[in-house]
Curated annotation (Swiss-Prot):
InterPro entries cross-referenced by the UniProt entry: Energy-convert_hydgase-B_suP
Top-level taxon: Archaea
Protein's recorded name: Uncharacterized protein MJ1436
Organism (species): Methanocaldococcus jannaschii (strain ATCC 43067 / DSM 2661 / JAL-1 / JCM 10045 / NBRC 100440)
Family: To M.thermoautotrophicum MTH1236.
Amino acid sequence: MPKMVLLPRMTMALGGYIRETTFPYEEDDEVKPFPYRNVIVGNPTDEPIKIEVPAYNEGWIERHKKLGLIVVPVNEDDDFVGLFQMVKEKVKNAKRE
């Protein structure tokens, strides 16, 4: 799977890195849509972290939370700018190691 580096103390939206219609690496023949419009990811650490792109399923969110990232899925009716600013503040205020 392709990867991208999320730099230390960086926040970004993965709207362009979401595969919306299929899980190409699963053997399940049923096509399932990705349940979110966007995903906001923040790296509160002082180390770069590799993330998998594109996001294919909800398991992506849990896998990346385990890496120490702040991961916030965005639904159609959510306030994207407000959520992005919230994650940005959490990253900014995270304790330095």
